[in-house]
């Protein structure tokens, strides 16, 4: 009987090893996504001087209680190694961003609670998508709470001294931004009550080699649009 227990334990450990260290992170995160993807042109826009030094100081000062980052609801440090905190809608930071979006003609979109992300030396986030998969039970719950993440703006509050770029893996495009710059892209759009996803929106945070990188995630949702 003990032999069967040992064999079963060995199989469990072996499968766990395969999942954690052999399968590429892209498979772990995205193989489940069997959705219709858009073949439309995908573009990433650079927003120069998106934030000034004073605005950045306010945002960083409101960032407290950082915790280890999660992938949806899972702690997967081999996929995402960083710390995050949320900035609620009653903060000065949120009002700064809301005003900027209104001036950009994006007032129809709801904005999720802002997320500050800190990457220390060795910090990274493997290739991933920002949109919620409506065919995934867990992500569907987030979709019902926050709406779909139609667009993303990612701003650099503090660039790393070396490394720490943002790479769009499907189009092999790397952005190495300066303080105050941001990048802006579409994650998906909707046709006849069906979300069409931009497969080329997959992106990753490249490892920080020196210094610290601090970024701001701004997700624009369709919560009140339909």
Predicted regions and their residues:
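Fe(II)/2-oxoglutarate oxygenase catalytic core
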Residues: 2-184, 188-226
């Amino acid at each position: 009987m003990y032999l069967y227990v040992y064999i079963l334990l060995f199989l469990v450990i072996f499968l766990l090893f395969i999942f954690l260290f052999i399968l590429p992170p892209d498979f772990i995160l995205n193989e489940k996504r069997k959705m219709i993807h858009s073949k439309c042109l995908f573009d990433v826009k650079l927003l120069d001087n998106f934030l000034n030094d004073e605005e950045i100081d306010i945002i960083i000062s409101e960032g407290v209680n950082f915790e280890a980052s999660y992938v949806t609801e899972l702690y997967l440090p081999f996929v995402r190694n960083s710390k995050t905190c949320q900035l609620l809608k009653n903060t000065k930071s949120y009002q700064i961003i809301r005003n900027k979006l209104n001036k950009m003609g994006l007032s129809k979109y709801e904005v999720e609670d802002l997320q500050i992300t800190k990457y220390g030396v060795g910090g990274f986030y493997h290739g991933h998508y920002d949109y919620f998969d409506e065919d995934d039970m867990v992500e569907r719950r987030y979709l019902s709470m926050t709406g779909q993440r139609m667009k993303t703006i990612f701003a650099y509050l503090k660039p790393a001294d070396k490394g720490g770029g943002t790479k769009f893996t499907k189009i092999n495009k790397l952005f190495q931004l300066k303080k105050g710059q941001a990048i802006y892209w579409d994650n998906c759009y909707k046709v006849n009550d069906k979300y069409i996803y931009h497969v080329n929106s997959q992106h990753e945070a490249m490892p920080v080699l020196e210094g610290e990188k601090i970024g701001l995630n701004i997700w624009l949702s369709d919560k009140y649009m339909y």
